[in-house]
């Protein structure tokens, strides 16, 4: 089978990019007879996967994103004689002429619509039902995601397949001697709690700052924020100054994946009280690195974290503040969260995700052929 992957999102930093890279790396490592065709919107990524056996790279150009998805990809699929088209994010060609599969990374536009621009909400509410209808199969990164897409858009549950993500193997316990260079590179304080993610309203960074301000005089820890700036980030950045926290909040900006494990190892807790996460990969990355986790009762993070994290109401500033104090002051709780977190992270595997995804692709291709 010749499988084409729509890889327009490789340039977009964040969870979907991490998912795409890790999934493709493991898919190509499997002993498989299938050929993988990487479809890029430009030549920027040519050579990224091309040295692998059974991998072909193709540049498919089109001036607009929607046109690339709906016009250029079907044309390329016909020219390349693809058996299946896969998109690691939301979107598939509506008239592809062959089976399609996409991965759903959450239904946040339905769950918390108030934080999204009207244009985003309109696009998702119109197009998601169409994509689900046209796709031969849909992969969701959580079981909750399956339930949500059935509830919000009436998708056919028989098409939906939960496949969990995982932390990359680079996230692990490191020797303290290996951490000094990273501390110096990013000018990290001696004691700190950590936030990881792109700044946008979903991440609830403003409430995290308010919670941190409430306990500022009770802890010696700084707050380190790792990640890039996303939409509506200006409000979060302004909140730091508004709350008088300029000297206690360290913003590193974007950090390469190779440096993140050391930062997790140095942190005394990960704080991820998001309004919604479609998976929440930092939860598993922190756990695998021996970092206690505080995350939300909402979204998909409870499914990912299990009993290995402290869960808080993300809209309750006092609840977040109390949880931070508990983790930093209760050594028995910290030890329990670290031990459970290491065990929990070990339950997830990118190899298993690749194997399960490939089975979905094979099933979708068979289903599509029967429908012809």
What annotation goes with each model-predicted range?
Residues 1-372:
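Carbohydrate transferase catalytic cores enriched for Leloir-type hexosyltransferases
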């Amino acid at each position: 089978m010749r499988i084409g992957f729509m890889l327009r999102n490789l340039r977009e930093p964040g969870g979907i990019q991490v998912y795409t890279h890790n999934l493709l790396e493991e898919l190509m490592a499997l002993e498989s007879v299938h050929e993988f065709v990487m479809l890029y919107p430009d030549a920027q990524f040519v050579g990224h996967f091309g040295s692998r056996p059974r991998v072909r790279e193709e540049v498919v150009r089109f001036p607009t994103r929607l046109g690339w998805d709906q016009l250029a990809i079907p044309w390329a699929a016909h020219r390349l004689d693809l058996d299946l088209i896969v998109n690691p994010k939301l979107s598939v060609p509506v008239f592809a002429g062959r089976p399609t599969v996409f991965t759903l990374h959450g239904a946040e536009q339905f769950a918390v619509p108030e934080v999204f621009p009207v244009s985003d909400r309109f696009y998702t509410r119109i197009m998601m039902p169409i994509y689900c209808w046209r796709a031969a199969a849909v992969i969701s990164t959580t079981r909750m995601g399956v339930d949500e897409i059935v509830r919000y858009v009436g998708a056919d549950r028989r098409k939906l397949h939960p496949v969990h993500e995982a932390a990359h193997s680079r996230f692990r316990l490191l020797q303290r001697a290996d951490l000094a260079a990273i501390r110096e590179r990013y000018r990290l304080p001696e004691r700190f709690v950590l936030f990881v993610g792109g700044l946008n309203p979903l991440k609830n960074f403003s409430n995290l700052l308010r919670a941190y301000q409430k306990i500022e005089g009770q802890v010696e820890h700084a707050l380190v924020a790792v990640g890039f700036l996303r939409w509506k980030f200006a409000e979060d950045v302004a909140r730091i100054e508004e709350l008088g926290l300029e000297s206690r909040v360290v913003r590193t900006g974007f950090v390469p994946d190779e440096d993140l494990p050391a930062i997790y190892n140095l942190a005394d807790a990960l704080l991820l009280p998001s309004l919604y996460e479609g998976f929440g990969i930092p939860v598993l990355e922190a756990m695998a690195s021996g970092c206690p986790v505080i995350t939300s009762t909402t979204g998909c993070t409870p499914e990912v974290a299990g009993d290995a994290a402290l869960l808080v109401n993300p809209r309750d500033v006092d609840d977040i503040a109390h949880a931070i104090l508990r983790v930093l002051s209760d050594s028995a709780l910290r030890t329990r969260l670290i031990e459970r977190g290491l065990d929990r992270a070990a339950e997830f595997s990118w190899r298993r995700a690749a194997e399960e995804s490939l089975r979905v692709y094979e099933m979708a291709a068979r289903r599509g052929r029967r429908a012809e």
